[in-house]
Amino acid sequence: IGIDSTHAAGSTRLAQVLRGRLLSEGYAPADVLFFEPQPGKGNLVVRLHGSGRAPPVLYLAHLDVVEARPEDWSVPPFQLTERDGDYLGRGVVDMKGEVASLVANLIRLRREQYRPARDLVVAFTSDEESGGTLSGAEWLLAEHRDLVTAGLVVNPDGGGGEIVGGARSSLRLQTGEKVYASFRFEATSPGGHSSLPVPG
């Protein structure tokens, strides 16, 4: 939360901090690859090697967050704050909480010398939020498809869950995402009524 990774600030610093943390835990440099296809647009691909030949499982996590104007917040947006049992800060929900969880699990799996049946790959990417100019996920597919080709892709940013009365109530699985498209139409016609369409 403390690292500003808005569109204006970029995701490079956060990607480099995560890379340093994973390298300090014993991951090989060849398994923690940093890419910066544009200045400030850092991406990271991490691989935990498995024992089998099955296609990897790929987890996606974007590093960027929506812009935050401090005057719109009751707490500093780039400082993790706990209030009444809730954590507040830009990106806690979307999606630095998930990023932290993925990194913590990569560290734990490494420390426990866990060897999955297939490779686990995590792609930490730039520019998922609106306003970005270079989707890190799309760039990785175009430029390094071999690193992110997988038998199963998990996006913890999709779906969601619900807690009711302090207990987990549901966990939703999302298999698609709505997208938006902007169109501009211009028509010239003498007008009329749908019951009497104008020819042509």
Residue ranges and their predicted role:
Residues 1-92, 111-118:
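Acidic/His- and Gly-rich active-site-bordering loop/insert found
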Residues 61-63, 84, 126-127, 150, ...:
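Fold-independent oxyanion-binding glycine-rich loops
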Residues 41, 54, 75, 117, ...:
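Short, solvent-exposed loop/turn segments at the edges of secondary structure
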Residues 95-173:
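Acidic/histidine-rich catalytic neighborhood of metal-dependent amide-processing enzymes
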Residues 7, 93, 128, 191-195:
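A generic structural motif
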Residues 167-169, 188-196:
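Flexible glycine/proline-enriched surface loops and loop-helix/loop-strand junctions
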Residues 138-139, 195-200:
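A short core secondary-structure module
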